[in-house]
């Protein structure tokens, strides 16, 4: 659910319902494109980019594929004409664990051989560059492989990682 539209990920596409009508995925007319019409937009990348997760971040929607991250943006309102998807970073992710936000950052898992790392995605305040720092660099063997769930608490400044493997 994003900006009063119900959305789905379908391979490389993001599909949104009509504005305010969550179960309508067909345009009102075929001769004109209305601002309230459904949206069906694809990511464009040199690698195969099957979308795995979508997470709200700041005023946009972050889209996660196996080897790249994208940002879905729209000026003012989300319409078929104003929607754009741009590549922000290119990190390999753990596909089973949905990224979580805490404060001004977004966290996601990355495979590291027999272990898993956690990246902290944020937009740099002065340069507006997108980057993801490895917040587990000081303990690279702490989280075992098989990450399937991330949970966050901004009150406790904590990220919880659940894995299928034992430590």
What does each of the following model-derived ranges do?
Residues 6:
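Short conserved active-site loop signatures built around small residues
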Residues 13, 19-20, 42-167:
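Beta-sheet-dominated scaffold domains
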Residues 22-38:
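Acidic/polar low-complexity surface segments
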């Amino acid at each position: 659910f994003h900006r009063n539209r119900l959305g789905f990920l379908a391979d490389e596409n993001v599909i949104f319902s009509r504005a305010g009508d969550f179960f309508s995925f067909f345009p009102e007319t075929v001769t004109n494109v209305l601002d309230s019409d459904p949206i069906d937009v694809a990511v464009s990348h040199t690698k195969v980019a099957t979308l795995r997760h979508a997470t709200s971040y700041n005023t946009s929607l972050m889209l996660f594929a196996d080897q790249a991250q994208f940002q879905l943006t729209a000026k003012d309102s989300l319409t078929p004409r104003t929607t754009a998807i741009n590549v922000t970073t290119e990190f390999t992710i753990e596909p089973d664990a949905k990224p979580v936000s805490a404060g001004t950052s977004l966290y996601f898992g990355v495979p590291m051989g027999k272990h898993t790392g956690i990246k902290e995605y944020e937009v740099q305040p002065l340069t507006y560059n997108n980057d993801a720092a490895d917040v587990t660099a000081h303990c690279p063997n702490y989280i075992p492989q098989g990450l399937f769930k991330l949970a966050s608490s901004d009150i406790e400044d904590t990220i919880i990682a659940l894995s299928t493997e034992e430590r």
